[in-house]
Amino acid sequence: MKMKAYAKINIALDAIGKREDNYHLLRMIMQTVDLYDVIDIEKSNDSNISISCNKHYVPTDERNLAYKAAVLFRDEFNIKDGVKINIKKNIPVAAGMAGGSTNAAAVLVIMNKLFNVNASLEVLKEIGLKIGADVPYCIEGGTALCEGIGEIITPLKPFENKILVVLKPNFGVSTKEVYTNLDINKIRKHVNIEGLIQAMENDDLDYVSKNMKNVLENVTLKKHTILKNIKEDMRKSGALGAMMSGSGPTVFAFFDDMLTAQRAFEFLKGKYKYSDVYITRTINSNNL
């Protein structure tokens, strides 16, 4: 059984506090984009969970979130059968686009169908939260306000068909490290989430592009100053606005029209030769 597992961007990311377990309390606007991995799962003749992937640098053992998802799903529903999971990877790794989380989400959804468990999406989200904070959102997809550590999800009016260029530099970032180095007391200006939601409901891409904000830039951009240059180059190439997604290092920019986006894509691909550059669009849902 095969399924597309879509990437996400953060149109807003704010940190407003900390839980006792040191997890940050967040307010985020999440958005699915039309960039995806393909997850293919079949039952195996033994009780093993095996993973294969078209990218050699992706772990195929218990470090992979897809593996963790399969283990948790089997444990939850007392399933003894093994599964073979194939991941066709297109979403960049360690990029702030929930590549691992969306794979885990797809595994839960596929196994739910494959084994005729018929668990509700809410139950799948509860399992997903044990894997990672982004997994519940990846099960739901679309345009959403995510709060708590990301598990409290409020669907928003779809903000679809917006053109964007996405650039993932040739290095990864540790999400854990970024959050460890984030000092909430030093956040001078919090994100106007309500203003952004209103603008998105009004389909005002210009306002959204100029007012989107990610407080994690305070950490990642200090360590990787090249990201400032990428944002500036995107703006100079005609972007309405540019921002880092998640903990980074991926930077994305919204564009008014495909021609300007195409020119920016060519320029960025030429200048940042060892980076992954994509043109994509926002989409309504991940169709999970």
UniProtKB/Swiss-Prot annotation:
Enzyme class label: transferase
Reaction(s) catalysed (UniProt annotation): 4-CDP-2-C-methyl-D-erythritol + ATP = 4-CDP-2-C-methyl-D-erythritol 2-phosphate + ADP + H(+)
Record EC number: 2.7.1.148
Pathway participation: Isoprenoid biosynthesis; isopentenyl diphosphate biosynthesis via DXP pathway; isopentenyl diphosphate from 1-deoxy-D-xylulose 5-phosphate: step 3/6
Active site, renumbered: 8, 134
Gene Ontology molecular function, alphabetical: 4-(cytidine 5'-diphospho)-2-C-methyl-D-erythritol kinase activity; ATP binding
InterPro entries linked: GHMP_kinase_C_dom (IPR013750), GHMP_kinase_C_sf (IPR036554), GHMP_kinase_N_dom (IPR006204), IspE (IPR004424), Ribosomal_Su5_D2-typ_SF (IPR020568), Ribsml_uS5_D2-typ_fold_subgr (IPR014721)
This protein's UniProt keywords: ATP-binding, Isoprene biosynthesis, Kinase, Nucleotide-binding, Transferase
Residues that coordinate or bind ATP: 92-102
GO biological process: isopentenyl diphosphate biosynthetic process, methylerythritol 4-phosphate pathway; terpenoid biosynthetic process
Family indicated by similarity: Belongs to the GHMP kinase family. IspE subfamily.
Function: Catalyzes the phosphorylation of the position 2 hydroxy group of 4-diphosphocytidyl-2C-methyl-D-erythritol.
Designated name of the protein: 4-diphosphocytidyl-2-C-methyl-D-erythritol kinase
Source organism (scientific name): Clostridium perfringens (strain ATCC 13124 / DSM 756 / JCM 1290 / NCIMB 6125 / NCTC 8237 / Type A)
Organism classification: Bacteria, Bacillati, Bacillota, Clostridia, Eubacteriales
